């Protein structure tokens, strides 16, 4: 039995609120249960030096957690003078995932920077960030098309992500913090709207997991992401 009385395959309620802030070309508040992440997409003309003259764009991401997004206050990373390895890993994951969804040639020599700030954390912050960032990205691309900066839509498909894991011997979908902290296996899965894999991050925190359990977890993720994509589409409609 899960602490929240959800069934093994049941995700938390997902809410996506667009145009959450006034200034960014795309902005979204995404909520996976009690996990809340603000995702903004900033569109700028020009690309990093390593891409100049290549006729293609760039999408990158930054990620951070507010000091009191967790149960006890943590120092801002700026105050510590450097980002943690976890932060660097997560923002690279977000950037990689979003780049998979964009035709960089169609983007032209333009850059989109995604900022994901965790307001409240209850497990699954990186998967919520990817899900919300995708919608913010869509809005930023639509803004650029509306301004005549882009002729064609560079978006190839929507992407979303969810966590899965083995908790008390049972594969489950969309772990909240209490489950994540006690899980024997923890996995984050990023997929396209058609169910193709973009990234799988999986670790046996306790007992090693079997091939059969891996397949079961991926099926749970596919089911969960399908439902999350439906929420994205409803938000964008």
Curated annotation (Swiss-Prot):
<dbReference type="GO" id="GO:0006364">
    <property type="term" value="P:rRNA processing"/>
</dbReference>
<keyword id="KW-0820">tRNA-binding</keyword>
<keyword id="KW-0819">tRNA processing</keyword>
<dbReference type="GO" id="GO:0008033">
    <property type="term" value="P:tRNA processing"/>
</dbReference>
<dbReference type="InterPro" id="IPR015847">
    <property type="entry name" value="ExoRNase_PH_dom2"/>
</dbReference>
<keyword id="KW-0694">RNA-binding</keyword>
<dbReference type="InterPro" id="IPR050080">
    <property type="entry name" value="RNase_PH"/>
</dbReference>
<keyword id="KW-0548">Nucleotidyltransferase</keyword>
<dbReference type="InterPro" id="IPR036345">
    <property type="entry name" value="ExoRNase_PH_dom2_sf"/>
</dbReference>
<dbReference type="GO" id="GO:0000175">
    <property type="term" value="F:3'-5'-RNA exonuclease activity"/>
</dbReference>
<dbReference type="Pfam" id="PF03725">
    <property type="entry name" value="RNase_PH_C"/>
</dbReference>
<dbReference type="GO" id="GO:0016075">
    <property type="term" value="P:rRNA catabolic process"/>
</dbReference>
<comment type="similarity">
    <text>Belongs to the RNase PH family.</text>
</comment>
<comment type="subunit">
    <text>Homohexameric ring arranged as a trimer of dimers.</text>
</comment>
<keyword id="KW-0698">rRNA processing</keyword>
<dbReference type="InterPro" id="IPR020568">
    <property type="entry name" value="Ribosomal_Su5_D2-typ_SF"/>
</dbReference>
<dbReference type="InterPro" id="IPR018336">
    <property type="entry name" value="RNase_PH_CS"/>
</dbReference>
<keyword id="KW-0808">Transferase</keyword>
<dbReference type="InterPro" id="IPR002381">
    <property type="entry name" value="RNase_PH_bac-type"/>
</dbReference>
<feature type="binding site">
    <location>
        <position position="86"/>
    </location>
    <ligand>
        <name>phosphate</name>
    </ligand>
</feature>
<dbReference type="Pfam" id="PF01138">
    <property type="entry name" value="RNase_PH"/>
</dbReference>
<feature type="binding site">
    <location>
        <begin position="124"/>
        <end position="126"/>
    </location>
    <ligand>
        <name>phosphate</name>
    </ligand>
</feature>
<dbReference type="GO" id="GO:0000049">
    <property type="term" value="F:tRNA binding"/>
</dbReference>
<dbReference type="GO" id="GO:0009022">
    <property type="term" value="F:tRNA nucleotidyltransferase activity"/>
</dbReference>
<dbReference type="InterPro" id="IPR027408">
    <property type="entry name" value="PNPase/RNase_PH_dom_sf"/>
</dbReference>
<comment type="function">
    <text>Phosphorolytic 3'-5' exoribonuclease that plays an important role in tRNA 3'-end maturation. Removes nucleotide residues following the 3'-CCA terminus of tRNAs; can also add nucleotides to the ends of RNA molecules by using nucleoside diphosphates as substrates, but this may not be physiologically important. Probably plays a role in initiation of 16S rRNA degradation (leading to ribosome degradation) during starvation.</text>
</comment>
<protein>
    <recommendedName>
        <fullName>Ribonuclease PH</fullName>
        <ecNumber>2.7.7.56</ecNumber>
    </recommendedName>
</protein>
<dbReference type="InterPro" id="IPR001247">
    <property type="entry name" value="ExoRNase_PH_dom1"/>
</dbReference>
